[in-house]
């Protein structure tokens, strides 16, 4: 709908330019936003205020000319001027109802991509191996997964790349520690965190041990069979731990998506050679660097992008450049999204620019750093255990499930006291599992990607506010309508007719699902989908309260309201699925 309004405004601008009202050569960015108060229309634009000065007119006078010039359209009932010169657009109720009937009949809810389908590489999760995933890996994993799901829903070909840290100094450290232990020490690897901490302690305390670790890194890089065998074993155990976390979280990541740093080892020397051939490298204290004038330090000197250390070793930038080339040459990506901590923003700005200058990626290939903020504890500091240690992600999820189970068990007892049929233990465990995992994920996804946020079990498990339990309950409320009806959502007849204010408000929100999904795909911001679903659930609650469904006054009204309820249920479920959340029929 927003695209339609933009096109209509552009046609009006073209007409006013042709008749001399507007000067030639104006190319405004036409903004169309949702109104906060639907009594003032469904959409609004400030285009008249933007162009009043170049037109030499008062904003309201230009707005009046625009209203006259905007062509009639079946989707619009009227256009009005508000305040200093806003244009308010009112949807046609008959067209709106018909569009919702079409959406209900469509398995994709009438959602289509705004633009051609693309091949999109999603770089997500990417934990360092040789130790277990911790809470710091949550955001990249679930935000990347949600955006990948949205892009797939819109018809893009999505290629997930789990760029795990499976190479580097930490492996020399672990190999050296394994040398010192009894033969059965390999069994300890099943608690990777304990093993890693012990090795790190030796590395920090013993210079001889640290030297041996570095020697083993060199042997590993040279292809020593024994080192490679143990390195492979470390990675297998690490990836097995990771997969358990992914399965527990319900994210679409598997072993087939793993493309670690080591996968690019054979290309690193060639990356340096190609940068040299392009004349981009400068030697600085023995290191090979690319200096970009666009990026300077506080003294005004260009910052280096180091691609080879003085000792010959390679860095993250070198591996990232090799990965970009692979993603162009082999994966044929049109767009690459990097879900990596916001603190790496400068790094990505630099390597993107180097990749383009070197010709590793074409100008038309989109490279986007989808940075995110930090998950903190209640004190606003990075989330830690009580003794200051790193919180394992699997432990966090287990606690979430345990807390959710206790919550739903208490509500189940209240259910029995009211004379309602209680859930059995198997059902309670499943409900607790879904509520627990969904709550952790939704609490994160509902925050703006670039913002830091404080982790709080009590808030995220609440049945009030913008939380997973609230939305899950909204889904079960819709499902209960059709259980009482004794009929499936797919068997509905009649058509949607919009009469009451609550029906119109709900319908207007449902109609915006397609625009919203396209916006999430464009910007990589799942919190917009969370906010949409929360508002949709609230509007359904108001509709449910004020517009009787099963006891409607006549069959046509009942059919219409059932269809609105069905479309709401499907939209909520589809939206939650795109966020990577499970839903429940009853809770």
UniProtKB/Swiss-Prot annotation:
Disulfide bonds: none annotated. One of its GO terms (biological process) is arginyl-tRNA aminoacylation. It is found in: Cytoplasm. InterPro entries: aa-tRNA-synth_I_CS, Arg-tRNA-ligase, Arg-tRNA-synth_N, Arg-tRNA-synth_N_sf, ArgRS_core, DALR_anticod-bd, Rossmann-like_a/b/a_fold, tRNAsynth_Ia_anticodon-bd. It catalyses: tRNA(Arg) + L-arginine + ATP = L-arginyl-tRNA(Arg) + AMP + diphosphate. Its EC number is 6.1.1.19. SUPFAM superfamilies: Anticodon-binding domain of a subclass of class I aminoacyl-tRNA synthetases, Arginyl-tRNA synthetase (ArgRS), N-terminal 'additional' domain, Nucleotidylyl transferase. One of its GO terms (molecular function) is arginine-tRNA ligase activity. It is an enzyme of class 6 (ligase). Transmembrane segments: none annotated. HAMAP family: Arg_tRNA_synth (MF_00123). Belongs to the class-I aminoacyl-tRNA synthetase family. Monomer. This is Arginine--tRNA ligase.
């Amino acid at each position: 709908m927003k695209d339609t309004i933009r096109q209509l405004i552009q046609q009006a601008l073209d007409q006013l330019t042709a008749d001399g009202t507007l000067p030639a050569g104006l190319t405004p960015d036409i903004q169309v936003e949702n109104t906060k108060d639907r009594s003032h229309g469904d959409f609004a634009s400030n285009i008249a205020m933007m162009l009043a000065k170049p037109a030499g007119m008062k904003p309201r006078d230009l707005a009046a000319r625009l209203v006259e010039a905007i062509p009639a359209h079946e989707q619009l009932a009227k256009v009005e001027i508000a305040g200093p010169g806003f244009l308010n657009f009112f949807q046609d109720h008959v067209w709106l109802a018909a569009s919702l009937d079409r959406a209900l009949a469509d398995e994709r809810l009438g959602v289509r991509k705004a633009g051609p389908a693309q091949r999109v590489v999603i770089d997500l999760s990417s934990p360092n191996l040789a130790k277990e995933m911790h809470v710091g890996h949550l955001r990249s994993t679930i935000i990347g997964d949600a955006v990948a799901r949205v892009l797939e829903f819109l018809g893009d070909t999505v290629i997930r790349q789990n760029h795990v840290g499976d190479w580097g100094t930490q492996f020399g450290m672990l190999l050296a520690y394994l040398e010192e232990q009894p033969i059965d020490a390999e069994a300890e690897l099943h608690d990777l965190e304990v093993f890693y901490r012990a090795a790190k302690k030796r590395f920090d305390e013993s210079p001889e041990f640290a030297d041996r670790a570095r020697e083993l890194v060199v042997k590993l890089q040279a292809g020593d069979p024994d080192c490679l065998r143990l390195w492979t074993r470390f990675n297998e155990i690490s990836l097995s731990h990771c997969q358990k976390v992914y399965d527990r979280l319900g994210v679409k990541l598997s072993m087939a998506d793993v493309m670690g740093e080591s996968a690019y080892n054979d290309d690193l020397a060639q990356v340096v050679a190609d940068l040299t051939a392009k004349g981009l490298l400068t030697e600085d204290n023995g290191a090979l660097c690319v200096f970009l004038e666009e990026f300077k330090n506080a003294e005004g000197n260009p910052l280096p992008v180091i691609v080879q250390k003085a000792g010959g070793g390679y860095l993250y930038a070198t591996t990232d450049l090799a990965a970009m080339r692979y993603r162009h040459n082999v994966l044929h990506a049109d767009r690459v999204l990097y879900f990596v901590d916001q603190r790496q923003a400068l790094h990505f700005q630099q390597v993107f620019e180097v990749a383009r200058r070197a010709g590793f990626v074409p100008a038309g290939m989109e490279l986007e750093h989808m940075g995110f903020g930090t998950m903190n504890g209640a004190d606003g500091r990075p989330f830690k255990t009580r003794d200051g240690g790193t919180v394992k992600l699997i432990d966090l999820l287990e606690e979430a499930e345990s807390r959710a189970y206790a919550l739903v068990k208490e509500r189940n007892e209240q259910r029995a006291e009211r004379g309602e049929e209680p859930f059995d233990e198997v059902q309670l465990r499943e409900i607790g599992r879904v509520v627990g995992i969904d709550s952790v994920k939704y609490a994160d996804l509902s925050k703006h990607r670039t913002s830091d946020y404080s982790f709080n079990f009590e808030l995220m498990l609440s049945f009030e506010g913008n939380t997973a339990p609230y939305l899950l309950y909204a889904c079960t409320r819709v499902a209960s309508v059709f259980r009482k009806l004794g009929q499936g959502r797919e068997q509905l007849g009649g058509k949607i007719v919009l009469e009451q204010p609550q029906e119109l408000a709900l319908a207007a929100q449902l109609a915006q699902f397609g625009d919203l999904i396209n916006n999430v795909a464009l910007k990589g911001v799942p919190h917009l989908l969370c906010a949409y679903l929360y508002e949709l659930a609230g509007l359904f609650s108001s509709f449910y309260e004020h517009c009787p469904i099963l006891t409607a006054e006549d069959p046509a009204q009942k059919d219409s309201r059932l269809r609105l309820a069905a479309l709401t249920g499907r939209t909520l479920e589809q939206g939650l699925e795109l966020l990577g959340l499970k839903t429940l029929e009853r809770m």
